[in-house]
Amino acid sequence: SIEEIVKSGKFSFLDNLNVTFSKGWERSKKLQESFRDSLDKDRALGYTSKGPHRMDITFQVNNKKASSNLSRGQLKILILLIFLTNIKLIKQITQRETLLMIDDLGSELDVKNLRSLIEQIILSENQIVLTGIEGEEMHQSIKKLTNFTQINL
């Protein structure tokens, strides 16, 4: 989970990460009640305004929105960690292997964060396709893979 990764200390900028969920309808109502109450409005609008499809997940760091508080590289790390967590959940539920494809992994990342992120990707035990122009920095980190092929274009 992201919480386990944060506790590992590999990405210290996430130490004060807070994740909140809003379910997409009023807290005081059950889903069916919310659907009923908004039916006329939804028909007029032509779409369903309440429901799980309206759920929001908000990430905050130091009590500020992550999107406005983190650098582009830090946001990239957070998003990839979310994907890795979701992939782990998908594998547990479906009992199927996944393929993780990441283009230009190293862009906007310093060497330390690139190595830490690659370590998390390797730990996910997925089939992985990575692209990048980083060369040696990325190559050193992925040498840990048992079945590794590098293609230089």
Locate the predicted segments by residue.
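Conserved NTPase motor "head" modules and their coupling/switch loops across ABC/AAA+ ATPases, GTPases
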Residues: 1-99, 108, 112, 116-127, ...
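Walker B catalytic acidic pair
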Residues: 103-105
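A short helix-turn-beta junction within AAA+ P-loop NTPase domains corresponding to the substrate/partner-engaging
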Residues: 141-153
